[in-house]
């Protein structure tokens, strides 16, 4: 099995599955000198390469290049894609590609991967990859189409980004009138709200940031034309500008 891209997502997946497979090869110039072309005998690959947002559009050029190389080396290879890609771009990829959205945090990626409760597999290869990861305990495997899998990823991240922006904007506007920590501890008791994404970040700054929320929110606005999310982006920018 090839791990193509060994950032925090690829590494978490690769290290977790490595003890359960015959051979694990890392393909990433920052971590090894291995090349895809030298592993035509590989039957499967996990792809976790960057998909930055450029001018509001998800740049999937690295994915397209990697998938092209993998299929050139072995036309029958099974590919598990973990990089975030909008549905319209995802559907242009070959049927070999099964989409498996990740919900890992950069600081706790290995722990998050080991403790995930839902494992989404979008595409024709879902049954194959469920067998590959069948050693995982306490996980619900959900097989669906690639578009639905991609929508789950984007709606998950943009919903949480919106939650951050909402709570932080209210704090900025009227935070002097209430006890914020007490407020969120009370609201966290409501199951339909939950405890996450209400507090300030570790440095006390306002607005969402990090590896995923900014790029995913912009890309999803480009894909959907959502006016609500466009407003969230504008509000978040103001929050960040006012706390730098």
Task: Give the residues covered by each predicted segment.
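Hydrophobic anchor at the start of a short beta-strand
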Residues: 1, 21-27, 77, 96-97, ...
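Internal alpha-helical scaffold of NAD(P)-dependent oxidoreductase catalytic cores
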Residues: 19-20, 92-98, 109-196, 223-229, ...
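Rossmann-like NAD(P)(H) cofactor-binding subdomain of soluble oxidoreductases
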Residues: 44, 52-109
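Structural motif
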Residues: 44-48, 120
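Glycine-rich phosphate/pyrophosphate-binding beta-alpha loops
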Residues: 105-106, 157-161, 191-193, 203-217
